[in-house]
Amino acid sequence: MEKPWWSTRFFKKYFLMKISVELFGAAREFSTKSHLDFELIENSSIKDLRNQMIDFVDLNFKGNETFKKIIKSSAFCSSDDKIVSDNYKIVKKQNFSIIPPIGGG
């Protein structure tokens, strides 16, 4: 069976970006490493990254609803320390941080 076109080396080399997400707070439970790496198509948005992280939780943590809630309610911060919205376009390889809300009273 032939591989899908998006899995070819050409596609990965020219159309996919490697995005690293540094994990903070409760998000540190997503990995034994301090970050997670994802591949996104050029011009993806933070919303796309957020959705890919939710897919990661579905696959690796059997859809843990608490982890999904953390991802949905977290802010994302760019490598230049600016909070970015869900519609922020990722146009090149970038690093982000996921900043979960702080609990307490």
Regions inferred by a protein language model and the residue ranges of each:
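Ubiquitin-like/PB1-type beta-grasp interaction modules and other compact soluble beta-rich domains
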Residues: 2-104
